[in-house]
């Protein structure tokens, strides 16, 4: 964005030659998701109201006029985005407004992407599905004002079971996945907490790394490789 309009233009540059190899793709949201084979990128186009309502697939090196529309949101109130799942098996398309969401998915190896609906949108219901270790995790506020996390083995029959139950006055956050671990957050009594669960044993414990009573923890996965037992943690507090 060179005008401050937040309509972003995408350029693709080849690292070896430093040459721009694709004609500019204009009026996008700025986000890019690469295919695993690096042959394609997925991006969203902005409409005249500055809402991302269309997801396109662009084949690198081809004309932009050949870009394939793979998803379009019909509601002017909703915006869309696309991302790769943590286990790199699926692409998830998220469409939402301020208090309602809906999600679609398709496999990374689909030559002709055909997004499939996970759950029909319901006014006031927010949900976000992620996949890891042959399971699907749903972070949702359906029948759970402060959210919960459900789990299922398949998105076809969707036999959801409770993974992290809703609790009074506890805000349940989402999950970060590693090969052997699931790290999640929650907030209670205005304090943020991190918990780590061993996938094999199911044992979960709180991550505490400060003697201070009030602090805000955070987690960041700097490396792409999730086959690790190490993560980068940080925190801030009135003292630190």
Regions found by a protein language model. Give the residues of each.
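Peripheral, non-catalytic segments that deliver or gate enzyme domains
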Residues: 1-240
């Amino acid at each position: 964005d060179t005008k401050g309009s937040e309509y972003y233009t995408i350029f693709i540059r080849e690292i070896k030659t430093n040459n721009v190899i694709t004609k500019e793709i204009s009026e996008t949201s700025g986000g890019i998701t690469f295919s695993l084979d690096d042959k394609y990128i997925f991006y969203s186009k902005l409409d005249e109201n500055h809402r991302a309502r269309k997801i396109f697939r662009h084949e690198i090196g081809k004309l932009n006029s050949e870009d394939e529309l793979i998803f379009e949101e019909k509601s002017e109130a909703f915006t869309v985005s696309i991302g790769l799942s943590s286990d790199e098996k699926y692409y998830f398309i998220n469409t939402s407004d301020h208090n309602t969401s809906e999600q679609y998915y398709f496999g990374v190896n689909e030559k002709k992407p055909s997004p499939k609906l996970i759950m029909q949108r319901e006014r006031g219901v927010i949900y976000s599905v992620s996949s890891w270790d042959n399971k699907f995790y749903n972070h949702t506020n359906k029948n759970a004002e402060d959210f919960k996390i459900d789990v299922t083995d398949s998105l076809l029959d969707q036999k959801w079971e409770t993974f992290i139950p809703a609790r009074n006055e506890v805000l349940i956050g989402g999950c970060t996945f590693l090969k052997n671990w699931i790290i999640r957050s929650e907030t209670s009594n205005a304090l943020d907490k991190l918990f780590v669960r061993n996938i094999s044993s199911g044992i979960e414990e709180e991550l505490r790394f400060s003697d201070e009573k009030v602090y805000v923890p955070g987690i960041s996965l700097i490396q792409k490789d999730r086959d690790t037992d190490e993560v980068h943690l940080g925190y801030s507090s009135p003292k630190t």
